[in-house]
Amino acid sequence: MLSGLMVLHFYYWGANQFIVQRALAAKSDKEARAGVITAGFAKLLIPFISIGTGIAAYYVFAERMPGVQVDGDTAFPLLLREVVAPAGIAGLVGLVAAGLIGAILSSVDSMLNSAATLITFDFYKRFINPQATDRQLIRIGRVLIGVMVVGCALLTIAVFDPNTKQLFFTYVASHQSKLVGGVVVAFAVGMLWKGATAAGGFASIITGVVVSYAVVPVYGATLGKTELFSGMFGSNLNFFHGVFVAAIFAVLANIVVSKMTQSDEQKSSLTFVGLGVFTEASLRTLITKVTLSLLLYALLGFLMWQEIAVPLVAALVASTWTWLMFINTNLQSLLTASSKGRVQSLIREDKFWGGLLAACAIFMLYYFK
Protein backbone atom coordinates (compact mmCIF):
# COMPACT_ATOMS: atom_id res chain seq x y z
CA MET A 1 0.00 0.00 0.00
CA LEU A 2 2.88 2.38 0.74
CA SER A 3 4.60 1.64 -2.55
CA GLY A 4 2.66 1.36 -5.79
CA LEU A 5 -0.64 2.56 -4.36
CA MET A 6 0.93 5.93 -3.58
CA VAL A 7 2.09 6.21 -7.19
CA LEU A 8 -1.39 5.32 -8.44
CA HIS A 9 -2.97 7.96 -6.20
CA PHE A 10 -0.54 10.60 -7.45
CA TYR A 11 -1.60 9.65 -10.96
CA TYR A 12 -5.34 9.68 -10.25
CA TRP A 13 -5.41 13.04 -8.49
CA GLY A 14 -2.57 14.82 -10.26
CA ALA A 15 -2.15 13.51 -13.80
CA ASN A 16 -5.43 11.82 -14.66
CA GLN A 17 -6.96 13.72 -17.58
CA PHE A 18 -10.59 13.39 -16.54
CA ILE A 19 -9.78 14.67 -13.04
CA VAL A 20 -7.46 17.43 -14.23
CA GLN A 21 -10.01 18.73 -16.74
CA ARG A 22 -12.49 19.28 -13.91
CA ALA A 23 -9.91 21.31 -11.99
CA LEU A 24 -9.05 23.33 -15.09
CA ALA A 25 -12.73 24.21 -15.50
CA ALA A 26 -12.80 25.99 -12.10
CA LYS A 27 -12.95 29.78 -11.94
CA SER A 28 -9.85 30.09 -9.78
CA ASP A 29 -7.04 28.02 -8.28
CA LYS A 30 -8.72 28.17 -4.87
CA GLU A 31 -12.00 26.80 -6.24
CA ALA A 32 -10.10 24.07 -8.09
CA ARG A 33 -8.37 23.01 -4.87
CA ALA A 34 -11.65 23.15 -2.96
CA GLY A 35 -13.31 20.94 -5.57
CA VAL A 36 -10.56 18.33 -5.46
CA ILE A 37 -10.56 18.30 -1.64
CA THR A 38 -14.36 17.92 -1.53
CA ALA A 39 -14.19 15.05 -4.01
CA GLY A 40 -11.45 13.47 -1.89
CA PHE A 41 -13.64 13.43 1.23
CA ALA A 42 -16.45 11.84 -0.80
CA LYS A 43 -13.96 9.29 -2.13
CA LEU A 44 -13.14 8.20 1.43
CA LEU A 45 -16.71 6.93 1.81
CA ILE A 46 -16.45 4.47 -1.07
CA PRO A 47 -14.56 1.74 0.85
CA PHE A 48 -17.16 1.79 3.63
CA ILE A 49 -20.04 1.62 1.15
CA SER A 50 -18.52 -1.12 -1.00
CA ILE A 51 -17.12 -3.16 1.90
CA GLY A 52 -20.32 -2.75 3.90
CA THR A 53 -22.36 -3.97 0.95
CA GLY A 54 -20.00 -6.91 0.48
CA ILE A 55 -20.23 -7.94 4.14
CA ALA A 56 -24.03 -7.70 4.01
CA ALA A 57 -24.07 -9.79 0.85
CA TYR A 58 -21.90 -12.47 2.48
CA TYR A 59 -24.33 -12.98 5.37
CA VAL A 60 -27.44 -12.73 3.17
CA PHE A 61 -26.16 -15.37 0.76
CA ALA A 62 -24.94 -17.61 3.61
CA GLU A 63 -28.46 -17.57 5.07
CA ARG A 64 -30.54 -17.79 1.90
CA MET A 65 -28.20 -19.86 -0.31
CA PRO A 66 -26.10 -22.02 2.05
CA GLY A 67 -23.26 -23.85 0.37
CA VAL A 68 -23.42 -21.77 -2.81
CA GLN A 69 -20.20 -19.99 -3.82
CA VAL A 70 -21.01 -16.50 -5.12
CA ASP A 71 -18.45 -14.61 -7.22
CA GLY A 72 -17.80 -10.99 -6.36
CA ASP A 73 -18.80 -9.83 -9.84
CA THR A 74 -22.28 -11.36 -9.47
CA ALA A 75 -22.93 -10.28 -5.87
CA PHE A 76 -24.68 -7.01 -6.72
CA PRO A 77 -27.26 -8.40 -9.19
CA LEU A 78 -27.94 -11.27 -6.79
CA LEU A 79 -28.58 -8.75 -4.01
CA LEU A 80 -31.10 -7.03 -6.26
CA ARG A 81 -32.85 -10.36 -6.81
CA GLU A 82 -32.73 -11.58 -3.21
CA VAL A 83 -33.21 -8.35 -1.26
CA VAL A 84 -34.56 -5.50 -3.38
CA ALA A 85 -37.05 -7.33 -5.59
CA PRO A 86 -38.86 -9.14 -2.71
CA ALA A 87 -39.51 -5.75 -1.08
CA GLY A 88 -42.41 -5.39 -3.50
CA ILE A 89 -41.90 -1.67 -4.14
CA ALA A 90 -42.73 -0.89 -7.75
CA GLY A 91 -39.78 0.46 -9.70
CA LEU A 92 -37.25 0.05 -6.88
CA VAL A 93 -35.11 -2.46 -8.79
CA GLY A 94 -35.11 -0.19 -11.82
CA LEU A 95 -34.19 2.81 -9.68
CA VAL A 96 -31.22 1.02 -8.11
CA ALA A 97 -30.10 -0.33 -11.48
CA ALA A 98 -30.42 3.14 -13.01
CA GLY A 99 -28.26 4.57 -10.24
CA LEU A 100 -25.59 1.94 -10.89
CA ILE A 101 -25.65 2.50 -14.65
CA GLY A 102 -25.59 6.27 -14.15
CA ALA A 103 -22.51 6.01 -11.94
CA ILE A 104 -20.77 3.84 -14.53
CA LEU A 105 -21.64 6.17 -17.40
CA SER A 106 -20.49 9.18 -15.39
CA SER A 107 -16.99 7.71 -15.24
CA VAL A 108 -16.98 6.23 -18.73
CA ASP A 109 -18.05 9.42 -20.48
CA SER A 110 -15.30 11.37 -18.71
CA MET A 111 -12.71 8.82 -19.81
CA LEU A 112 -13.97 8.82 -23.39
CA ASN A 113 -14.05 12.60 -23.54
CA SER A 114 -10.52 12.81 -22.15
CA ALA A 115 -9.18 10.19 -24.56
CA ALA A 116 -10.82 11.89 -27.53
CA THR A 117 -9.40 15.25 -26.45
CA LEU A 118 -5.88 13.88 -26.13
CA ILE A 119 -5.94 12.14 -29.52
CA THR A 120 -7.61 15.08 -31.28
CA PHE A 121 -5.27 17.80 -30.05
CA ASP A 122 -2.02 15.93 -29.37
CA PHE A 123 -2.05 13.73 -32.46
CA TYR A 124 -4.56 14.82 -35.12
CA LYS A 125 -4.08 18.58 -34.90
CA ARG A 126 -0.36 18.39 -34.17
CA PHE A 127 0.72 15.91 -36.83
CA ILE A 128 -2.10 15.42 -39.36
CA ASN A 129 -4.02 18.68 -39.76
CA PRO A 130 -2.48 21.65 -37.91
CA GLN A 131 -4.98 24.03 -39.59
CA ALA A 132 -8.05 22.10 -38.42
CA THR A 133 -11.03 24.23 -37.43
CA ASP A 134 -13.03 23.79 -34.23
CA ARG A 135 -15.84 22.16 -36.22
CA GLN A 136 -13.42 19.62 -37.68
CA LEU A 137 -11.94 18.88 -34.26
CA ILE A 138 -15.40 18.33 -32.79
CA ARG A 139 -16.30 15.97 -35.64
CA ILE A 140 -13.07 14.00 -35.22
CA GLY A 141 -13.66 13.81 -31.46
CA ARG A 142 -17.16 12.40 -31.95
CA VAL A 143 -15.91 9.79 -34.40
CA LEU A 144 -13.13 8.79 -32.01
CA ILE A 145 -15.59 8.35 -29.14
CA GLY A 146 -17.73 6.05 -31.28
CA VAL A 147 -14.70 4.02 -32.35
CA MET A 148 -13.46 3.73 -28.77
CA VAL A 149 -16.87 2.60 -27.48
CA VAL A 150 -17.03 -0.19 -30.05
CA GLY A 151 -13.37 -1.08 -29.55
CA CYS A 152 -13.67 -1.25 -25.76
CA ALA A 153 -16.80 -3.41 -26.01
CA LEU A 154 -15.03 -5.86 -28.33
CA LEU A 155 -11.94 -5.85 -26.11
CA THR A 156 -14.06 -6.64 -23.06
CA ILE A 157 -15.65 -9.59 -24.85
CA ALA A 158 -12.20 -10.82 -25.87
CA VAL A 159 -10.48 -10.60 -22.46
CA PHE A 160 -13.29 -11.19 -19.95
CA ASP A 161 -13.85 -14.79 -18.92
CA PRO A 162 -17.20 -15.13 -17.10
CA ASN A 163 -16.00 -18.39 -15.51
CA THR A 164 -12.86 -16.93 -13.93
CA LYS A 165 -12.57 -16.57 -10.17
CA GLN A 166 -10.51 -13.38 -10.49
CA LEU A 167 -12.47 -10.17 -10.04
CA PHE A 168 -12.76 -8.25 -13.30
CA PHE A 169 -12.00 -4.96 -11.50
CA THR A 170 -8.73 -6.39 -10.15
CA TYR A 171 -7.84 -7.70 -13.60
CA VAL A 172 -8.38 -4.29 -15.20
CA ALA A 173 -6.63 -2.42 -12.38
CA SER A 174 -3.56 -4.65 -12.56
CA HIS A 175 -3.08 -3.89 -16.26
CA GLN A 176 -4.07 -0.23 -16.06
CA SER A 177 -1.56 0.33 -13.27
CA LYS A 178 1.27 -0.77 -15.55
CA LEU A 179 0.67 2.25 -17.77
CA VAL A 180 0.73 5.03 -15.19
CA GLY A 181 4.01 4.76 -13.26
CA GLY A 182 6.06 6.38 -16.01
CA VAL A 183 3.42 9.06 -16.58
CA VAL A 184 3.58 10.12 -12.92
CA VAL A 185 7.37 10.30 -13.11
CA ALA A 186 7.28 12.35 -16.32
CA PHE A 187 4.97 14.91 -14.67
CA ALA A 188 6.78 14.98 -11.33
CA VAL A 189 10.32 15.27 -12.70
CA GLY A 190 9.22 17.84 -15.25
CA MET A 191 7.68 20.05 -12.57
CA LEU A 192 10.50 19.71 -10.06
CA TRP A 193 13.65 19.68 -12.21
CA LYS A 194 14.44 22.31 -14.83
CA GLY A 195 16.90 19.96 -16.51
CA ALA A 196 14.15 17.54 -17.58
CA THR A 197 13.58 17.24 -21.33
CA ALA A 198 10.76 15.94 -23.52
CA ALA A 199 12.92 12.98 -24.51
CA GLY A 200 13.49 12.19 -20.84
CA GLY A 201 9.76 12.29 -20.15
CA PHE A 202 9.07 9.99 -23.10
CA ALA A 203 11.80 7.61 -21.92
CA SER A 204 10.30 7.47 -18.43
CA ILE A 205 6.86 6.59 -19.83
CA ILE A 206 8.22 3.78 -22.02
CA THR A 207 10.48 2.50 -19.23
CA GLY A 208 7.58 2.48 -16.78
CA VAL A 209 5.46 0.30 -19.06
CA VAL A 210 8.27 -2.13 -19.93
CA VAL A 211 9.46 -2.57 -16.34
CA SER A 212 5.89 -2.92 -15.02
CA TYR A 213 5.25 -5.90 -17.28
CA ALA A 214 8.72 -7.41 -16.81
CA VAL A 215 9.25 -7.06 -13.06
CA VAL A 216 6.53 -9.52 -11.95
CA PRO A 217 7.73 -12.58 -13.95
CA VAL A 218 11.40 -11.70 -13.33
CA TYR A 219 10.74 -11.47 -9.59
CA GLY A 220 8.87 -14.77 -9.60
CA ALA A 221 11.77 -16.51 -11.35
CA THR A 222 14.51 -15.02 -9.15
CA LEU A 223 13.93 -13.19 -5.86
CA GLY A 224 10.52 -14.76 -5.32
CA LYS A 225 12.22 -18.11 -4.81
CA THR A 226 14.38 -16.86 -1.94
CA GLU A 227 13.20 -17.16 1.65
CA LEU A 228 13.91 -13.51 2.50
CA PHE A 229 11.92 -11.89 -0.30
CA SER A 230 9.15 -14.47 -0.42
CA GLY A 231 8.61 -13.87 3.29
CA MET A 232 8.29 -10.11 2.78
CA PHE A 233 6.54 -9.86 -0.60
CA GLY A 234 5.36 -13.39 -1.33
CA SER A 235 6.45 -15.74 -4.08
CA ASN A 236 4.47 -13.69 -6.61
CA LEU A 237 4.98 -9.92 -6.58
CA ASN A 238 1.81 -7.88 -6.11
CA PHE A 239 1.23 -5.45 -8.97
CA PHE A 240 1.27 -2.52 -6.51
CA HIS A 241 4.93 -3.23 -5.76
CA GLY A 242 5.57 -3.64 -9.47
CA VAL A 243 4.32 -0.10 -10.08
CA PHE A 244 6.70 1.25 -7.44
CA VAL A 245 9.70 -0.55 -8.93
CA ALA A 246 8.72 0.70 -12.39
CA ALA A 247 8.52 4.27 -11.08
CA ILE A 248 12.07 4.03 -9.70
CA PHE A 249 13.44 2.82 -13.04
CA ALA A 250 11.41 5.51 -14.82
CA VAL A 251 13.07 8.21 -12.69
CA LEU A 252 16.51 6.86 -13.55
CA ALA A 253 15.63 6.72 -17.26
CA ASN A 254 14.31 10.28 -17.18
CA ILE A 255 17.46 11.63 -15.56
CA VAL A 256 19.87 9.73 -17.83
CA VAL A 257 18.09 10.64 -21.08
CA SER A 258 17.58 14.27 -20.00
CA LYS A 259 21.31 14.55 -19.31
CA MET A 260 22.02 13.21 -22.80
CA THR A 261 19.63 15.55 -24.62
CA GLN A 262 19.37 19.31 -25.03
CA SER A 263 16.75 21.04 -22.88
CA ASP A 264 14.49 23.85 -24.08
CA GLU A 265 15.32 27.00 -22.09
CA GLN A 266 11.77 28.35 -22.35
CA LYS A 267 10.17 25.08 -21.25
CA SER A 268 12.79 24.60 -18.55
CA SER A 269 11.36 27.62 -16.75
CA LEU A 270 7.93 25.94 -16.47
CA THR A 271 8.74 24.29 -13.16
CA PHE A 272 7.30 24.92 -9.71
CA VAL A 273 10.23 27.21 -8.91
CA GLY A 274 10.25 28.89 -12.32
CA LEU A 275 6.53 29.67 -12.12
CA GLY A 276 6.84 31.01 -8.58
CA VAL A 277 4.79 28.28 -6.93
CA PHE A 278 7.75 27.53 -4.65
CA THR A 279 11.03 29.17 -3.88
CA GLU A 280 14.08 26.94 -3.97
CA ALA A 281 14.18 26.99 -0.16
CA SER A 282 10.49 26.09 0.23
CA LEU A 283 10.83 23.33 -2.36
CA ARG A 284 13.75 21.83 -0.44
CA THR A 285 11.62 22.03 2.71
CA LEU A 286 8.77 20.23 0.93
CA ILE A 287 11.08 17.47 -0.32
CA THR A 288 12.47 17.07 3.21
CA LYS A 289 8.94 16.77 4.64
CA VAL A 290 7.95 14.18 2.04
CA THR A 291 11.13 12.17 2.63
CA LEU A 292 10.69 12.18 6.41
CA SER A 293 7.03 11.25 6.04
CA LEU A 294 7.82 8.29 3.79
CA LEU A 295 10.48 7.08 6.22
CA LEU A 296 8.01 7.35 9.11
CA TYR A 297 5.31 5.51 7.15
CA ALA A 298 7.77 2.74 6.26
CA LEU A 299 8.89 2.44 9.88
CA LEU A 300 5.30 2.20 11.12
CA GLY A 301 4.55 -0.39 8.45
CA PHE A 302 7.56 -2.43 9.55
CA LEU A 303 6.51 -2.22 13.21
CA MET A 304 3.02 -3.41 12.30
CA TRP A 305 4.46 -6.24 10.21
CA GLN A 306 6.55 -7.34 13.20
CA GLU A 307 3.44 -6.97 15.42
CA ILE A 308 5.25 -4.42 17.61
CA ALA A 309 2.74 -1.63 16.95
CA VAL A 310 -1.03 -2.11 16.85
CA PRO A 311 -2.92 -0.63 13.88
CA LEU A 312 -4.70 2.04 15.96
CA VAL A 313 -1.48 3.48 17.37
CA ALA A 314 0.24 3.44 13.98
CA ALA A 315 -2.79 5.09 12.39
CA LEU A 316 -2.92 7.87 15.00
CA VAL A 317 0.81 8.60 14.74
CA ALA A 318 0.85 8.60 10.93
CA SER A 319 -2.31 10.69 10.51
CA THR A 320 -1.27 13.26 13.13
CA TRP A 321 2.15 13.65 11.52
CA THR A 322 0.54 14.02 8.08
CA TRP A 323 -1.84 16.75 9.22
CA LEU A 324 0.93 18.68 10.97
CA MET A 325 3.06 18.58 7.82
CA PHE A 326 0.22 20.26 5.91
CA ILE A 327 -0.80 22.95 8.38
CA ASN A 328 2.71 23.86 9.53
CA THR A 329 2.90 26.77 7.07
CA ASN A 330 -0.64 27.86 8.00
CA LEU A 331 0.27 27.97 11.68
CA GLN A 332 3.32 30.09 10.89
CA SER A 333 1.23 32.57 8.90
CA LEU A 334 -1.38 32.70 11.67
CA LEU A 335 1.28 33.48 14.27
CA THR A 336 2.74 36.18 12.04
CA ALA A 337 -0.68 37.74 11.47
CA SER A 338 -1.50 37.57 15.18
CA SER A 339 1.73 39.36 16.07
CA LYS A 340 0.69 42.17 13.71
CA GLY A 341 -2.79 42.42 15.20
CA ARG A 342 -4.59 40.71 12.30
CA VAL A 343 -7.02 37.84 12.76
CA GLN A 344 -7.05 34.89 10.35
CA SER A 345 -9.14 31.73 10.44
CA LEU A 346 -7.33 28.43 10.07
CA ILE A 347 -10.42 26.62 8.79
CA ARG A 348 -10.62 28.99 5.83
CA GLU A 349 -7.29 27.71 4.53
CA ASP A 350 -7.45 24.91 1.96
CA LYS A 351 -4.25 23.38 3.36
CA PHE A 352 -6.13 22.80 6.61
CA TRP A 353 -8.76 20.71 4.83
CA GLY A 354 -6.23 19.15 2.47
CA GLY A 355 -4.18 18.07 5.45
CA LEU A 356 -7.27 16.71 7.19
CA LEU A 357 -8.18 14.75 4.06
CA ALA A 358 -4.67 13.30 3.78
CA ALA A 359 -4.66 12.49 7.50
CA CYS A 360 -7.98 10.63 7.22
CA ALA A 361 -6.71 8.65 4.24
CA ILE A 362 -3.49 7.71 6.05
CA PHE A 363 -5.46 6.75 9.17
CA MET A 364 -7.64 4.39 7.13
CA LEU A 365 -4.57 2.96 5.43
CA TYR A 366 -2.99 1.87 8.72
CA TYR A 367 -6.09 1.12 10.77
CA PHE A 368 -7.64 -1.20 8.20
CA LYS A 369 -4.17 -2.36 6.96
Enumerate the predicted regions with their spans.
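Membrane-embedded helix-loop-helix hairpins and adjacent transmembrane boundary segments
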Residues: 1-369
